[in-house]
């Protein structure tokens, strides 16, 4: 049997050569548990005559990855094999790769079509020796298999569908793309990115340094006008943003309801549903453009709008397709008055914004005055019990996981952009709270901090966290100035108000590394101190930028300009971790360069790249399934697998019991200290999750994407959760509702004979990668 090498030559397949290649990549791994010979034997069984070395490496990596239930180091080995394969297929020098990307010629028309920008190329040409010398390619080998495969699939740049970038090339491209001629800052950013202290958001990783450097994640729009012109002009804005893979939040509360009079045609309006079908089809059309991450929209509506009941049905699984929008997400922008009426079992008046104008433009007491005025004047379309609307909201959430819930009054009352006007919606993922109007489209650039990295020698390093936050602020602030904006209204807004969004990933990993149960008092205290540090560091960096460059244009009149910070708006006194009064004095003197700073977002893709748990979430399971070309296999929480392996508690019976129990270890005979630390989200009281969100909320000047997890949701459970979050002053009451299926799928992958009453075995576990 022969293999075809990269140079086209044939060579006999040699078992020893395969084993040797695997063994070379096992440096630093736990050799008590990693068995290169077993992997090589499985590879030999899976190859065919004429297999290429690239295919051989791919198969070897996948086989190693399937062994991750034996030991987490197998995931690192799998990644090393895949990375080694990529290194053999790509050029080493960063400058050479950038030159190839810049010199790209479209094969269909023969035209020069540079993939990276001319300024990026100019910077690389001037500093190529320095940039080439500081790149450390060994850091590519630190990714786990799934992180690396995520990079391969969507992030590393390609020429004619062939990957030409290595992960380190991508990170240096991002750093140079942001900092351009400031080469020292570029190298500082590169090192922090490649050491995994933080990551920029996906659009920045995709596009920094390229010819279309659209690096922003979030765009917030209001419907420009309740007219054909306004609706379709807004649709065009959405299409142009979606084309550049931006996520959209759109407020439609000013669009007249169904049955309302249209003076121009002497007819009646069809309401928001047919209009949203048009938006839905636009989202589907843009989706066909081959974007790495197609743009999607969340539609925001206030619950007084008389089309509210039809709106709540938009994503349901049954009903007339003409009344469904499967490709849009829906969210409610809820005033406090509605929550009070639900609580008091009061009546709720449904209104048309054409006949009851201005409700979307006011909040708090002013909203209540205007709304009750319209009620007294009997301008409403209909009156129903507030709890009828509430029940429809809960039913929709139980069936579809949506609508998302945000509290209009908290969002406006606690915003440092309150001086700009009424904020009418959030973004796609409910963590961005920014002002927009007909002439301005709000934008936000994001990055997330890998909190697990700051657990050093059993302690959390707050000083290092503050230092990294300050680098992120400077980076995101630069992106505002150099970004490619899909529409001019976005550029106007972003350069006037200069908001940024700093989030986190790996909070659960940090707790585990410190041996803190997620719901422990120690974890709750650390949660507060982490976000206090992030907010402090972000303010300090933004103030230092303002000292050099001046405050943002609309700073005067903001809360911060009057010495009021986010925690003041929550009536919270910070800990003594940082000295806040001198910082407040400095802000009074120099101002801030950025209107908003902190916004914990979902981090699904980037957390997978870095091998961390998502955002501020606990682990949802301790075991889950991954699919690769060669089939499906199980992956175990690497922290749990490592501790069980070290304590000689890991075996097939444990693995099978965890799988039978849907990723839980609570029904095992494992030690109690392990059970406490490795509770899943389903085993942690949701009120604790909500309380921790409120605790950190005092240091989050935008908002946070907070999911609610209830295995078997009911009207009473969900109502209790929502009212608890509202009473604590949360801005985002709920992103998704996550539930468990009514019945678990049959566990075909398990050997039923092996599922016995669990007894922890203290004997040596098998160290080979057995099938």
UniProtKB/Swiss-Prot annotation:
Pfam families: ATP-cone, Ribonuc_red_lgC, Ribonuc_red_lgN. GO terms for biological process: deoxyribonucleotide biosynthetic process. Residues 1-92 form the ATP-cone domain. It is an enzyme of class 1 (oxidoreductase). Its cofactor is Mg(2+). GDP binds at residues 202, 217, 427, 431, 603-606. DTTP binds at residues 226-228, 243, 256. ATP binds at residues 5-6, 11-17, 53, 57, 88. GO terms for molecular function: ATP binding; ribonucleoside-diphosphate reductase activity, thioredoxin disulfide as acceptor. Keywords: Allosteric enzyme, ATP-binding, Deoxyribonucleotide synthesis, Early protein, Magnesium, Nucleotide-binding, Oxidoreductase. The active site is at 427 (proton acceptor), 429 (cysteine radical intermediate), 431 (proton acceptor). Its EC number is 1.17.4.1. Gene3D superfamilies: 3.20.70.20. It catalyses: a 2'-deoxyribonucleoside 5'-diphosphate + [thioredoxin]-disulfide + H2O = a ribonucleoside 5'-diphosphate + [thioredoxin]-dithiol. Changing residue 509 to Y: In strain: Garcia-1966. Maximal ribonucleotide reductase activity requires the presence of Mg(2+) ions. CDD domains: RNR_I (cd01679). Induction: Expressed early in the viral replicative cycle. InterPro entries: ATP-cone_dom (IPR005144), NrdE_NrdA_C (IPR013346), RNR_lg_C (IPR000788), RNR_lsu_N (IPR013509), RNR_R1-su_N (IPR008926), Rrm1 (IPR039718). NCBIfam families: NrdE_NrdA. Interacts with RNR2/OPG047 subunit. Ribonucleoside-diphosphate reductase holoenzyme provides the precursors necessary for viral DNA synthesis. Allows virus growth in non-dividing cells. Catalyzes the biosynthesis of deoxyribonucleotides from the corresponding ribonucleotides. Belongs to the ribonucleoside diphosphate reductase large chain family. This is Ribonucleoside-diphosphate reductase large subunit. It comes from Variola virus. The lineage of its organism: Viruses, Varidnaviria, Bamfordvirae, Nucleocytoviricota, Pokkesviricetes.
């Amino acid at each position: 049997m022969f293999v075809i090498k990269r140079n086209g030559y044939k060579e006999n397949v040699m078992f020893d050569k395969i084993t040797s290649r695997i063994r070379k990549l096992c440096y630093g791994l736990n050799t008590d548990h990693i068995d290169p010979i077993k992997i090589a034997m499985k590879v030999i069984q899976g190859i065919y005559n004429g297999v290429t070395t690239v295919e051989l490496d791919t198969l070897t990596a996948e086989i190693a990855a399937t062994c991750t239930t034996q030991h987490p180091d197998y995931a690192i080995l799998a990644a090393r094999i895949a990375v080694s394969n990529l290194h053999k297929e790509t050029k080493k020098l960063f400058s050479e790769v950038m030159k190839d990307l810049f010199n790209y010629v479209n094969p269909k028309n023969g035209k020069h079509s540079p993939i990276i920008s001319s300024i990026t190329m100019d910077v690389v040409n001037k500093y190529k020796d320095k940039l080439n010398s500081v790149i450390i390619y060994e850091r590519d080998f630190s990714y786990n298999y799934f992180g690396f495969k995520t990079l391969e699939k969507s992030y590393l740049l390609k020429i004619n569908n062939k990957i030409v970038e290595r992960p380190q090339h991508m990170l240096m491209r991002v750093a140079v793309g942001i900092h351009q001629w400031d080469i020292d800052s570029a190298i500082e950013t590169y090192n922090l990115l490649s050491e995994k202290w933080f990551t920029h958001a996906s659009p920045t990783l995709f596009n920094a340094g390229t010819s279309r450097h659209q690096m922003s994640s979030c765009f917030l729009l209001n419907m420009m006008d309740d007219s054909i012109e306004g609706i379709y002009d807004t649709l065009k804005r959405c299409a142009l943003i979606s084309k550049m893979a931006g996520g959209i939040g759109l407020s439609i509360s000013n669009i007249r309801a169904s049955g309302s009079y249209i003076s121009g045609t002497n007819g009646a309006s069809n309401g928001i549903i047919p209009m949203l079908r048009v938006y839905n089809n636009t989202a589907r059309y843009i989706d066909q453009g081959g974007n790495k991450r197609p743009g999607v929209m969340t539609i925001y509506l206030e619950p007084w709008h008389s089309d509210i009941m039809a709106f709540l049905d938009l994503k349901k699984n049954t009903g007339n397709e003409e009344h469904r929008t499967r490709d849009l997400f829906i969210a409610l922008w809820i005033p406090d008055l509605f929550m009070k009426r639900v609580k008091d079992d009061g009546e709720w008046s449904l209104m048309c914004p054409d006949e009851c104008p201005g409700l979307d433009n006011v909040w708090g007491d002013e909203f209540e005055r205007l709304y009750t005025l319209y009620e007294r004047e009997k301008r409403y379309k209909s009156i129903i019990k507030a709890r009828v609307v509430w029940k429809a909201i809960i039913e929709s959430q139980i069936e579809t996981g949506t609508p998302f819930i945000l509290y209009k009054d908290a969002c406006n009352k606690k915003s440092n952009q309150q001086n700009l006007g009424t904020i009418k919606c959030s973004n796609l993922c409910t963590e961005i709270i920014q002002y927009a109007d007909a002439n301005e489209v709000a934008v936000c650039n994001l990055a997330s901090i890998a909190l697990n990295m700051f657990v050093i020698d059993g302690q959390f390093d707050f000083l290092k966290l503050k230092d990294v936050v300050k680098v992120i602020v400077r980076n995101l602030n630069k992106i505002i100035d150099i970004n490619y904006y899909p529409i001019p209204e976005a550029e106007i807004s972003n350069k006037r108000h200069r908001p940024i969004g700093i989030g986190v990933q790996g909070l659960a990993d940090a707790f585990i590394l410190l041996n803190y149960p997620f719901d422990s008092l120690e974890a709750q205290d650390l949660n507060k101190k982490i976000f206090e540090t992030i907010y402090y560091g972000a303010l300090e960096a933004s103030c230092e930028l303002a000292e050099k460059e001046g405050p943002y244009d609309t700073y005067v009149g903001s809360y911060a300009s009057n010495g009021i910070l986010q925690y003041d708006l929550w009536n919270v006194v910070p800990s003594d971790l940082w000295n806040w009064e001198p910082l407040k004095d400095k802000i009074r003197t120099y101002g801030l360069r950025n209107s908003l700073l902190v916004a914990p977002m979902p981090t699904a893709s980037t957390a997978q790249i870095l091998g961390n748990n998502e955002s501020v979430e606990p682990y949802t399971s301790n075991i889950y399934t991954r699919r690769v070309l060669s089939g499906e296999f199980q992956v175990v929480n690497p922290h749990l697998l490592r501790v069980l392996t070290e304590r000689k508690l890991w075996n097939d019976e444990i693995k099978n019991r965890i799988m039978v129990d849907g990723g839980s270890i609570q029904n095992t005979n494992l030690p109690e200290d392990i059970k406490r630390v490795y509770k899943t989200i389903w085993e942690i009281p949701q009120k604790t999750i909500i309380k921790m969100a409120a605790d950190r909320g005092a240091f989050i000047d935008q908002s946070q994407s907070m999911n609610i997890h209830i295995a078997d949701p009911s009207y009473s459970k969900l109502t209790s959760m929502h009212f608890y979050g509202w009473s604590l002053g949360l801005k985002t009451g709920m992103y998704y509702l996550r539930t468990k299926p009514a019945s678990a799928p049959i566990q075909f992958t398990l050997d039923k004979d092996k599922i016995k009453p669990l007894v922890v075995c203290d004997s040596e576990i098998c160290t080979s990668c057995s099938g």
